Amino acid sequence: MTEGHDMEGRNKFKPTRIFFLLAILLGVWTFFGLCCTDAAGSDANGLELRVMTFNIRYGTANDGDNAWDKRKDMVCGVLRQHEPDIVGLQEALRFQIDYIRAELPKYGEIGVAREDGYIKGEYSCILYRTDRFGVGESGTFWFSNTPAIPGSNTWGNACVRICSWARLIETKTGRAFYIFNLHLDHVSQPSREKSAVLLAERIKNRRYKEPYIVTGDFNSGENNPVIKYLKGEIAIEGSDGSSAKTQVPMIDTFRVLHPDVKYVRTAHEFKGTRQGNKIDYIFVPQGTKVLEAEILYDNVNGRYPSDHYPVTASFVLNVPF
């Protein structure tokens, strides 16, 4: 009698055991889920990012009703509304950057001023979300025959021109990528072409062969040899006099999704015009999956935050675990 009772007890349904097993399974599922997907948008197939390039117009310009003090809150409003993970700024002066960072403290900053490698002159700085990324390495180089010398200008540029760059590391996953942000000369085509070649060389020779992003005001329309070179379509001449195609061909994120859009002007002189050349770009490596890409026409009653439209793109960089 006792033996039969014991057998019945062993076969009896025990809810606590089932709940215990379910808890274990849930924990395992959650663990692998966190490994493969985190809240920032990363998954096992790549790193999802939202990037903006934004020429904010230098703040000492005599722009009257479009002066910096009358539009600085619109600039910050654009960043708040669209919430990019990374922003490449051009024409930013120290006091402009300070204002933006005070209003949007979640962004860290990478870069130096072009005239002295410190604080004098315009920056092509990079803003990045400090809650998501750390900085592995960073620097700035000058578009000249002496790219390590601050203020150097040997290619006939109307202005000193620079590129600031960084290797950013996603804190949660340890996955990393490079970001290069630049502003090419607005006058000299030979300077722009030499600058594009130097940029491609720096990308090719980066320490870690991880994906890269290039943002900037290229002062070059889509049919300019500079853009065709970066896309791997043609060869152009570098500072050493030789000509070759780039070894790091890129894609224009905007054109991946909008190949036939005609009105793509990005520098509009505060007029809000859309017909003309696109000179602001976000480039990524060939094969990158582009999710969204826009030229932003944000304005307040016909008043614009800058004389350039900001450009944004969301994409998945191929940085698997």
Regions from the PLM with identified roles:
Residues L49-I56, V75-I100, L127, A166, ...:
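Active-site beta-strand/loop signature of hydrolases that rely on acidic residues for catalysis
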Residues E3, E8-F20, W29-E103, D116-E122, ...:
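N-terminal, active-site-proximal structural segment of metallo-dependent hydrolase catalytic domains
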Residues Y58-D65, G136, Q189, V261-V264:
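Short, solvent-exposed loop/turn elements at domain surfaces
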Residues E193-L199:
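Charged helix-capping and loop-helix junction motifs
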Residues D43-G46, Q81, A102, G117-K120, ...:
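Extracellular/periplasmic catalytic domains that process cell-envelope and extracellular macromolecules
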Residues R132, P190, E201-Y212, S220-F321:
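Metal-dependent phosphoester-hydrolase catalytic domains
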Residues I86-F180:
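Structured beta-strand-rich core segments of catalytic domains in phosphoester-bond hydrolases
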Residues T53-D73, W142-C159, D185:
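Acidic/histidine-rich helix-loop elements
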